[in-house]
Amino acid sequence: RFIVANGLERYKTGKNLALTEYFFRPYSGNGHKPFTYDFDDTGGQADFTKQFVTKVMQTHSGQCRSLPMYYKVLAETLGAEAYIAYAPAHVFIRYRNEDKMYPEEWVNVELTTHQITPEFFYKEHFEISDKAIENKIYLTPLTDRETVAAQLADLAFGYWNKFKCYDEFTRCCTEKSLEYYPQHPKACIILGKSLDAALVKHLKENGYKEDACTRQIEAQSATLYEKLKALGWEDMSEELHDKLEKGNQE
């Protein structure tokens, strides 16, 4: 009804426009309560469930991961084209600028600030290298298969958050994630930590002796690290981390 009432059906991206309005502004359809960024426990350290899409649905507030994921869920329901995209420690929505409303090829929906954001902002604000963009680590719209694969890495991270260990489960999740989304840094990192845990476990069991198994695990870890470097991934500096945290607070 919102689409028809506002004449949005004449636009190719009318469903996206309606969804964006649904998130950004108060309407009867969202109970006059737009979706906002939850500044309390942004990383979910105190309560990991604050990262969940169900929390967004219940409270109309969430973080940079859960808000775009809910947008994606609703877009799929409406039959709208929308894609998950990553920046360092950040998630946002992209869709094609088919109606030429903006100067760029893609429309970037920043649900944390209620803005349509130009691409250069992400490059500058998150200090993303050209190499990382070329290798499709960041700013690349994910396919649905890649989006699901990324959730496997998130599942592995949630498992670690609950049980405080890396093991065969986190290893299986991330190996399968990388099978369908091979350049996903988060999956590479968690897999690397899972391999480290497997190495420690094996060394304890064999009396801390080097053998074929230890050499195999060490080789896998080295390959992962070299892969991350080749893709252009860089560990987030303290300065960038502090800048992003300050930006969240502001």
Locate predicted features.
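Terminal, low-structured helical/coil segments at or just beyond the last alpha-helical repeat
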Residues: R215-E250
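Short coil/linker segments at helix-helix boundaries
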Residues: N97, K201-L228
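Hydrophobic/aromatic-rich core segments of domains that either
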Residues: S66-E134
